[in-house]
Amino acid sequence: MDYKETLLMPKTDFPMRGGLPNKEPQIQEKWDAEDQYHKALEKNKGNETFILHDGPPYANGNLHMGHALNKILKDFIVRYKTMQGFYAPYVPGWDTHGLPIEQALTKKGVDRKKMSTAEFREKCKEFALEQIELQKKDFRRLGVRGDFNDPYITLKPEYEAAQIRIFGEMADKGLIYKGKKPVYWSPSSESSLAEAEIEYHDKRSASIYVAFDVKDDKGVVDADAKFIIWTTTPWTIPSNVAITVHPELKYGQYNVDGEKYIIAEALSDAVAEALDWDKASIKLEKEYTGKELEYVVAQHPFLDRESLVINGDHVTTDAGTGCVHTAPGHGEDDYIVGQKYELPVISPIDDKGVFTEEGGQFEGMFYDKANKAVTDLLTEKGALLKLDFITHSYPHDWRTKKPVIFRATPQWFASISKVRQDILDAIENTNFKVNWGKTRIYNMVRDRGEWVISRQRVWGVPLPVFYAENGEIIMTKETVNHVADLFAEHGSNIWFEREAKDLLPEGFTHPGSPNGTFTKETDIMDVWFDSGSSHRGVLETRPELSFPADMYLEGSDQYRGWFNSSITTSVATRGVSPYKFLLSHGFVMDGEGKKMSKSLGNVIVPDQVVKQKGADIARLWVSSTDYLADVRISDEILKQTSDVYRKIRNTLRFMLGNINDFNPDTDSITESELLEVDRYLLNRLREFTASTINNYENFDYLNIYQEVQNFINVELSNFYLDYGKDILYIEQRDSHIRRSMQTVLYQILVDMTKLLAPILVHTAEEVWSHTPHVKEESVHLADMPKVVEVDQALLDKWRTFMNLRDDVNRALETARNEKVIGKSLEAKVTIASNDKFNASEFLTSFDALHQLFIVSQVKVVDKLDDQATAYEHGDIVIEHADGEKCERCWNYSEDLGAVDELTHLCPRCQQVVKSLV
């Protein structure tokens, strides 16, 4: 008989190498074939629900790591909640309208001019649906589970209809109106442009400093003082209605040769130099904060119009005077700040960039040519302090390469001011993981201007507005609901296929259209209105979902995006937030914290990670990040993640190998009969389980990642599994000591597999399929382990023992270095009490110390002589073990004997081998 044949070595078909890129798709195919998503829902039917509502990614382009981070985090949550017994459906969605898809088609060579709007929109739809299929495949490959066979898509007729109904309800409440707002306007192509259609080139422009006389000093400034503004667009001076100063900046009133000028103190030297002032003759007479200057009134330099001094945070000291010429009809910042002060929006420029009748004496002039006429008039009025020319980077039309302007054009708005307080109240009633999340969205809503919901594009949901012959707006409950019904039946393309009269209710009349003629709005809705309607189009529409959602989770850019538009439309129509809990994550950067870009060559994409390493590595990486802030990824970081994965996998494999002959139904030992060391590990498992469950509840995956490693390394690898080899391999198969350990080992394996399942979805499933006697067909259909109270006294006792064991290991290491021993089984350990710790008394309640220390012999005495080394938990002496090495277990013994032809066996091994003969 060979010694090896008498050992109970680990046996499992679970492979050491993961081979994830090849194995994961096979596991996913099995899930799909079994329809695991619906099985998991069926299991928890009738239970408490948990709804995480998916913010829709844009249906264009390949997935980036930000997509992966987002969807994997959501999957952690939904899978965990499902395993906790919640009915947790997850319906993924896609955002499908907007300019990028129009541009993508143009790049593909689709010529819009050769087809009708309806035909072009059909092409956009086809393209969006193709993109969804590609992204869907990639999301699923990451192990994300959801209703991918029936996702929500913003271009679906029922969704568009729900969006129109939200618009109608807001219109009903007086929250939708038409006004003017500045947008990028290209006189050369006579159209508005989106930011994506802008490119920057150098342009030579006039640079002027202009004095505005004080008209009403409000008892703050001198009545004969003047504000100095600086601008590079003289043609916008006719549209000036205000001067903006920063509330927190210091401003000075400077006397220069008898004239009193108000400018920012931080810019006084630069202004003095620009205006050729003699520095010796400049005198600072008074100082103010920008806040103190608010509501002082200045006089327009050549029009019979006041210019109000207002506060704005956009004012900087980078250039100019700190007093900003403000024309809400010709600037984004000007418009936003103007809204707060209810300033008029003046924009006397037509589509071609020519002054209209409203431009007075400049009527008929091209805006750029009017620059000279304006500066001449300012000179004539004595208001021009300096004219210069500069070359600077300026926005141009990407098609025509000609300069663009900001020009106020008619736009549709959703009123924020009327619902702002209601939204802020709803935010107060929403839960956040971190307080700064609440502060961020609260401040954004508090400070935002009115919401421009119209876009001058074609690929989107049309604004359901009609016009009578006299230009009157028709936007009634009847007309809007009729459009919603049409969209629900035919989709929104019907708007572009039918005449206005055929989109109105049958027999519709209006006093403004005596001839029965109507026109329809040509603008479409902002895509944020699309996705921001998902609470109605999805949560309230799908039977398995409910409103409001328990949770929204997106990137931190969505505080101004989807989080914002969703709460706006929801509060406006339902009076409550669409989410009870809000969570955000940061952006994915490279290993050094830099933004990923092709030019830097630091881009890592999900497809590459999955193909090279596997989805479980990507998922484990997500769990290793502090996702509330920006996160980092690199080849080196992924290598570290792979190393951690390998350690987890090998630990699970070791446990699988050592329970191959264990049946929990027949071989388990009751808890009270377990060896104390096994009860200690069982309680450590319970402690680890409680902490992991708590971390899942609080979405703290980094804690899970760290605690899993700690549990595996400290409790299992460094102690229990190492200690266990002498029992699992050497002891008799059915011995109490071996079954006691297997009972706990089986529990650790099953519970750890469940606890890891939401993160390492494929590996946990693979482990489960190799675990004997589990009841559920899939770990993902099992329940999370229950949190059980721990025996604290036992844990405290064994923690002290583990500290003492660390001291023994240090002593063994020293003996090894001094060549007293080689392997630890060659050691005899003597431990005694010292001034710091009463080791001899403490160790009386521990059995089989030699096994616990993985040495051959242990002796506990009251005192040792001076040759002993003093440690925190006792004096320790290491000597070479007495006797000879047992050929079977490698422990040293003075009582070696033989069984059959097997010699050099210790008494324990003799007994075991006899039972086998």
From Swiss-Prot:
Please provide an example of a Pfam family that matches this protein in its UniProt record: zf-FPG_IleRS
Reaction catalysed? tRNA(Ile) + L-isoleucine + ATP = L-isoleucyl-tRNA(Ile) + AMP + diphosphate
The cofactors named for this UniProt entry are: Zn(2+)
* Primary localisation category: cytoplasm
> What residues bind ATP, as annotated?
K598
Query: Which residues take part in binding L-isoleucyl-5'-AMP?
Result: E554
This entry's comment on the bound cofactor is: Binds 1 zinc ion per subunit.
**InterPro entries documented for this protein:** aa-tRNA-synth_I_CS, aa-tRNA-synth_Ia, Anticodon_Ile_BEm, Ile-tRNA-ligase, Ile-tRNA-ligase_type1, Ile-tRNA_ligase, M/V/L/I-tRNA-synth_anticd-bd, Rossmann-like_a/b/a_fold
* One GO location term (cellular component): cytosol
Q: Which UniProt keywords apply?
A: Aminoacyl-tRNA synthetase, ATP-binding, Cytoplasm, Ligase, Metal-binding, Nucleotide-binding, Protein biosynthesis, Zinc
Short motif ('HIGH' region): ranges: 57-67
EC number assigned by the record: 6.1.1.5
**Where does it localize?**
Cytoplasm
**What does the protein in this record do?**
Catalyzes the attachment of isoleucine to tRNA(Ile). As IleRS can inadvertently accommodate and process structurally similar amino acids such as valine, to avoid such errors it has two additional distinct tRNA(Ile)-dependent editing activities. One activity is designated as 'pretransfer' editing and involves the hydrolysis of activated Val-AMP. The other activity is designated 'posttransfer' editing and involves deacylation of mischarged Val-tRNA(Ile).
Q: What is known of its domains?
A: IleRS has two distinct active sites: one for aminoacylation and one for editing. The misactivated valine is translocated from the active site to the editing site, which sterically excludes the correctly activated isoleucine. The single editing site contains two valyl binding pockets, one specific for each substrate (Val-AMP or Val-tRNA(Ile)).
Similarity remark: Belongs to the class-I aminoacyl-tRNA synthetase family. IleS type 1 subfamily.
Q: Supply the PANTHER family for this chain.
A: ISOLEUCINE--TRNA LIGASE, MITOCHONDRIAL, SOLEUCYL-TRNA SYNTHETASE
Assembly, in brief, is: Monomer.
Q: Which HAMAP family match?
A: Ile_tRNA_synth_type1 (MF_02002)
Q: What is this protein called?
A: Isoleucine--tRNA ligase
